[in-house]
Amino acid sequence: MFKCIPIFKGCNRQVEFVDKRHCSLPQVPEEILRYSRTLEELFLDANHIRDLPKNFFRLHRLRKLGLSDNEIGRLPPDIQNFENLVELDVSRNDIPDIPDDIKHLQSLQVADFSSNPIPKLPSGFSQLKNLTVLGLNDMSLTTLPADFGSLTQLESLELRENLLKHLPETISQLTKLKRLDLGDNEIEDLPPYLGYLPGLHELWLDHNQLQRLPPELGLLTKLTYLDVSENRLEELPNEISGLVSLTDLDLAQNLLEALPDGIAKLSRLTILKLDQNRLQRLNDTLGNCENMQELILTENFLSELPASIGQMTKLNNLNVDRNALEYLPLEIGQCANLGVLSLRDNKLKKLPPELGNCTVLHVLDVSGNQLLYLPYSLVNLQLKAVWLSENQSQPLLTFQPDTDAETGEQVLSCYLLPQQEYQPITPARDLESDSEPFEEREPSRTVVKFSEEATQEKETPFVRQNTPHPKDLKAKAQKLKVERSRNEEHANLVTLPEENGTKLAETPTETRTIANNHQQQPHPVQQPIVGVNSKQPVVVGVVTPTTTTVAPTGVQGGSEGASSTANNVKAATAAVVAELAATVGGSDEVQDDDEQEDEFESDRRVGFQVEGEDDDFYKRPPKLHRRDTPHHLKNKRVQHLTDKQASEILANALASQERNDTTPQHSLSGKVTSPIEEEEQLEVEQEQQQQQQQHPFDSSLSPISAGKTAEASTDPDNLDGVTELRLEQYEIHIERTAAGLGLSIAGGKGSTPFKGDDDGIFISRVTEAGPADLAGLKVGDKVIKVNGIVVVDADHYQAVQVLKACGAVLVLVVQREVTRLIGHPVFSEDGSVSQISVETRPLVADAPPAASISHERYIPAPIEIVPQQQHLQQQQQQPIQQVAPTHSYSGNVFATPTAAQTVQPAVSAAPNGLLLNGREAPLSYIQLHTTLIRDQIGQGLGFSIAGGKGSPPFKDDCDGIFISRITEGGLAYRDGKIMVGDRVMAINGNDMTEAHHDAAVACLTEPQRFVRLVLQREYRGPLEPPTSPRSPAVLNSLSPSGYLANRPANFSRSVVEVEQPYKYNTLATTTPTPKPTVPASISNNNNTLPSSKTNGFATAAAATIDSSTGQPVPAPRRTNSVPMGDGDIGAGSTTSGDSGEAQPSSLRPLTSDDFQAMIPAHFLSGGSQHQVHVARPNEVGVSAVTVNVNKPQPDLPMFPAAPTELGRVTETITKSTFTETVMTRITDNQLAEPLISEEVVLPKNQGSLGFSIIGGTDHSCVPFGTREPGIFISHIVPGGIASKCGKLRMGDRILKVNEADVSKATHQDAVLELLKPGDEIKLTIQHDPLPPGFQEVLLSKAEGERLGMHIKGGLNGQRGNPADPSDEGVFVSKINSVGAARRDGRLKVGMRLLEVNGHSLLGASHQDAVNVLRNAGNEIQLVVCKGYDKSNLIHSIGQAGGMSTGFNSSASCSGGSRQGSRASETGSELSQSQSVSSLDHEEDERLRQDFDVFASQKPDAQQPTGPSVLAAAAAMVHGASSPTPPAATSNITPLPTAAAVASADLTAPDTPATQTVALIHAEQQAHQQQQQTQLAPLGQEKSTQEKVLEIVRAADAFTTVPPKSPSEHHEQDKIQKTTTVVISKHTLDTNPTTPTTPAAPLSIAGAESANSAGAPSPAVPASTPGSAPVLPAVAVQTQTQTTSTEKDEEEESQLQSTPASRDGAEEQQEEVRAKPTPTKVPKSVSDKKRFFESAMEDQHKPTQKTDKVFSFLSKDEVEKLRQEEERKIATLRRDKNSRLLDAANDNIDKDAAQQRTKSNSNSSSGDDNDDSDQEEGIARGDSVDNAALGHFDDAEDMRNPLDEIEAVFRS
């Protein structure tokens, strides 16, 4: 009995999504079957389910079903019950066949049946017309159905791993197919009709038996990927040249012997794989594929490469392993981007010297060849690996320069050259132990030593020698080179780059600071030896063991650090040695990571003597560290080459020191090494430097110069001394769009480096015109941070994951190399370089002058940056603020540096907070606010937390609560704002800064649907807001009254303002400080009165008013904010956003009052905030009140203007009390594709042109050209000239006709231009985008089935678009619950009909549209587009729940609570007002036109307080042109009912149905008002002022305006309507002494007067004479112009001529009921008494609650029956009224004739006869009156069933 108590979890759950993947379920859980009414997505993948129960197929609402990776053995036919299924995945099961009943799943779009033993597809499978993605991999299919081409919507078809041999011919009908996978089948012949798939992008044909390709394959012009590997192809068709879009071509493992010439025309080809074929030569034109990046030619029979290979300038990877190459073409040096060249196992004997021009080559594999030496030009390359032998242990060897004996050329050699065949190592060598000391093993080694007497080297041919030890080889080489250098002249001169060609300092890298903490053992300074070899590039220096310690110098370490170190050394020789030792020199020992604890070990330097051998040199134990040989593709650092900039700085410092030396004994060293040796020596030192700089740049200001990364060069080797290469740092904001970010990355730890030996993350590709390109990102930028996360040391996959989880806005911090012009060389008289003139840029700390301050930009930051050091920032920026412009917006404006602006030195405090005296940037924080919405109570949020009190800390020295894990696909993952490492500051308003872990878990697991999180993210960067390319270029000032200056505190886009941090602390410690003195001239909020403080919060004053709108400024949610005022701020002062006081800000939940204050005033009044001015003149006798009722201002949206930047922007306003109400606007801006224009020539001598036009400057062109009107093609006749042309379509804009511009022409002028005589007509058209929602709908009606929809609109009909009264289109106004339209499901209420079976409805009348649809037959081809949104209209009138933005948010009508449920599905609530013509029966139903969509609620007779008669009359006046707010004036004292009816009849439209409805409404309201008035006590009578105000409210109904189109908010003309209310006092006297009552004039339309307008209001007869109440008679005079018919005037004259000689009280009571004739039936005293007693009893009876009546009728049928009853009753009553009036007129005529006859015959008759005649006439009149009342009672009786139906409908 208690199972349905709501506290139980399983009761009434609205479950829509269930995910039970990987749960080891043996069967479908039973609880899932309980959700049959709500469940839409069910995932049961990866379980052990064998059978599907019968009840499982009752889940009729399922849209997505996942059953993959189970053990299902049968798919029952009951699967046809899933009519709404869109996605089905049953792959990896044991299903033997697919039931034929699957054809009933007409909504299925994605299906996967892969990995099931299914031998064939069912015959009905081809009826799944909506399938777009179909997976049939790994099945046993041998054939496909012959009608497989019927799946015309297919975009992806996978048939891999089947047994297919043939394809059906109908497959060519799959015109939308983009991806076709036929790999791993048994296809021998590819059918030619496969080339007729115009949209194909990817084609997989690998692992088949193909021997040839059809020539028709060249027709696939959009094909980008073609894989035909592992087939038997012997040749390719030359038509392959037609694949102009092809980028990837895989021809591996075939039998090709030659390539067709057409392959050279594939200009977009980037990857070509031809390995394992039989190619003997390549085409000479293959080089025309200029975009080639990867060319694989492994295992062929090639003996040479074509010379055109040099044209492939983008080639990155060339692999020609295992061929028969004998030489390389010289043009190989033109491949500037070649990075990997593999020539293994060929017959090469030499390499061309031009190979040295491939500057980015880093891997060269020439093992297995016959090379004698390597070209000397390889020293210019930054090689990481040179493979010369199979058994090579290190990727890069030490090479020695040598001379070729035959040619005399300078070459490189090593111990593996000349190349020989591979010889295995002897076993004895393998047994040698590496653990024993080197000194002990050295005597047992076989070492080749060179004798020292061989001082002169002879030119000898290359002879293979035993490999010497590297130490001995180095000593010998140094000795030989130094001996040779002694004979050179000018040994101590520094040569120009033209003389020695030094290529040392050209490696672009960032400057690094060297920190050496190890003390070196002092050693005797060796005698320096001078030596320079002009034939070889050298580095001159002295190797001297001295103590050198280079301290870190921040970013500008480099040469400054080296120079400062050199100055500390006394001897100039030692200075040179120190520099060389610290930065460049011959260091053989630098500590690794695992050896850093060895701090006191001496750092020894090795120097070589020239005079004689030093025994101590050989006794010194060398520190050789064993390293594993890295693979050349695994990005293991092979050799750390010298950084180009580091080399520049060191060489410049050395040369500068040499030129500045004046002491004679300072001579140069004789150490001469090759650049490769030097780079090898620097390897380990640079590793140490990189370890010391974990985060070289942590700033995010854009642009940020990384200091002087390359100091001004003073050496001629540095690019002639005129430029420098520096690294600048930028922060770039990219907003993600639906197409992605438009960028690709490369590199990372463990991946092939993108640039040089840098294993960082680089931007490898930027999509043109994509988000990244528009944001300013460039290829080659190195990514430092992604949304605050450092990715310097991340691997590639980690970087990809960070980018995926970045959310909607991506904030990248990148480094970019920039070349700067810095100076020029100055030559002295002797021709030497005496000085380098460098433009010095002093880095001063003073603020720049006002003229150099850069432009200010308003940057909407994507996230809220809350720096801790904001006070420090204000102090640093104080000088700049003093000279800033007066109107600067300091909240989010920063200054970008201009050319005149300078940067401070690194040793001072930088204003941007990058580096302060060499320290890291200050730590800032990002405040994030997000709300996670559960789909159901109890659902997980998709993230885990760690930390908190009582739990192990997540971060050191912090016991806060942090996000530790985010579940992929969960709520947090889909939200996109939360990241791992974020600190949780608050959960649903609960402070979490000092909370326990269990408390946070309890808050997160509470049964609440909305979980509001406040997060804090660390942000190391500048204190200013970052730049954004989305921002406007220049924003000099902001209006103080504008939106940005007064925007609500909790309004947020994806970008929010910069605010100060608020901490979650108690308010008791808050101490107010005195206000700083702020001049009034710089105050921004001039209208704000001083506010007071209460409990630390600033309470907003009541007089806070926006100066521009006069509306209250929203209450602030937080007290402190960035100062928004203009002008400078005093030193040391801190300003608050409200009162200028500095205090810790606190967070409090947004209360209902705060939210109410943020809503604009015009929303509170429902759009009817009128300014009513009441002028009271001096009251003399009669009180007159003049009321000016202004036309209301149109509703303005609460949001600002929609953003115009690219990407998706979500704007929300959230009201949080016990529930949460959210208003959201999503703007998704995308780049518009350029419109295509072309010229079309049509012949005019063959008849009609076959198309129609619409539009012009004087005609509407809706729905085309909504933004720019013009002339458009509205219809194309099938089979006509325009249709046969094939270039024209509906919606094309006509720009010119025979060179005559018609873009601004009127409609008639355009027609005349088209009709001008001539043999042909030349049209210039523009293919404008089709209207939104444009589609073709084919409806098929079954026999006897109804179409089931209604239409509205068209010419000469009522307007069809309630949002735009000027729209003349035809719209779908209603979809019935049964019929073809409902069954099809594509037609929706509000759609615009464009064509029906080829008949255009643009410009058609309503009746024509109805006739076309009724005569369309069973097959109806409709062309529709989007019209208006029905749900938006319901929401706009405040009836759809949520936050109303419509016209009547304060008063509601009956039925308003229902219009969000079923009404939104069928449109039945709107149907009564929108539907004009039903298309299913022939009778004309246009009489059912109602007033307007906004007046769809009818007055309910059962309401205790119904709408007043005046409001109803206002509705009659406006008809269908202005909405009447329902129940807006429900308390107005009623007027005499006859006056109201008269006004309704006078002003209602001419349609009989409208008059009838108006009469019925007036009768209902009059009857109701009569009861209320008669039962009202006298003591409740209202004052005159109250009545006047109620009349004014009623008059508002006359000024309400219909809304414009939702997309347009035009400024409407302000119409002022004047209503004059004349109040006259009358005394009601129960004694009928006066035969007539004086009537105050009632003028409606200022022309006609109505009878009884001045009659007193009905009241209860007074019990005592003399106590009659005094009631005003009110006359309303308006300026509204209406028309009346002659019939109305006749009836009015008849009403006025009726005698009124009865009792006043009786007249008041009977006047309400006797509407057809004004004659009254006298009542006796007993009748009056009984009526009065019954009325008093009814007053005291309790109102009975209407029971809910069950009805089998649907809402549509009840509505139809109701309207038919109303129409019949109105028609019957009108006919009876006419007959009664005719009968009364006939009786009067007969009496007059008889009287004349009697008077003629009996002229002497007395007064008695006359009296009898008069009495007889009165009796006849009374009988007519009685008859009229009787008929009227009959009509009222007929309305009883209508009231019962209405009661059922209301319930």
UniProtKB/Swiss-Prot annotation:
InterPro entries: Leu-rich_rpt, Leu-rich_rpt_typical-subtyp, LRR_dom_sf, LRR_R13L4/SHOC2-like, PDZ, PDZ_sf, Synaptic_Scaffolding_LAP-MAGUK. Residues 656-672, 1080-1097, 1132-1149, 1448-1467 have a biased composition (Polar residues). It is a peripheral membrane protein. SMART domains: LRR_BAC, LRR_SD22, LRR_TYP, PDZ. Residues 731-818, 929-1019, 1239-1329, 1336-1428 form the PDZ domain. Gene3D superfamilies: 2.30.42.10, Ribonuclease Inhibitor. The keyword Transferase does not apply. The modification Phosphoserine is found at residues 433, 435, 700, 702, 705, 834, 837, 1031, 1041, 1475, 1477-1478. Residues 589-601, 676-686, 1807-1816 have a biased composition (Acidic residues). Keywords: Cell junction, Cell membrane, Coiled coil, Cytoplasm, Developmental protein, Differentiation, Leucine-rich repeat, Membrane, Neurogenesis, Olfaction, Phosphoprotein, Repeat, Sensory transduction. Residues 1468-1478, 1647-1669 have a biased composition (Low complexity). Residues 427-474, 584-641, 656-719, 1067-1150, 1448-1485, 1647-1751, 1772-1851 are annotated as: Disordered. It comes from the Eukaryota. PROSITE patterns: LRR, PDZ. GO terms for biological process: anterior/posterior axis specification, follicular epithelium; basal protein localization; cell fate commitment involved in pattern specification; cell fate specification; cell morphogenesis; cell-cell adhesion; compound eye development; dorsal closure. Disruption phenotype: Flies exhibit aberrant cell shape and loss of the monolayer organization of embryonic epithelia creating a corrugated cuticular surface that is riddled with holes hence the gene name scribble. Misdistribution of apical proteins and adherens junctions to the basolateral cell surface is also exhibited. One of its GO terms (molecular function) is protein kinase binding. SUPFAM superfamilies: L domain-like (SSF52058), PDZ domain-like (SSF50156). Residues 620-639 have a biased composition (Basic residues). Required for polarization of the embryonic, imaginal disk and follicular epithelia. Specifically restricts apical membrane determinants to the apical cell surface; acts to exclude crb from the basolateral domain and define adherens junction position. Regulates cellular growth and differentiation; acts as a tumor suppressor. Essential for odor guided behavior. This is Protein lap4. It comes from Drosophila melanogaster.
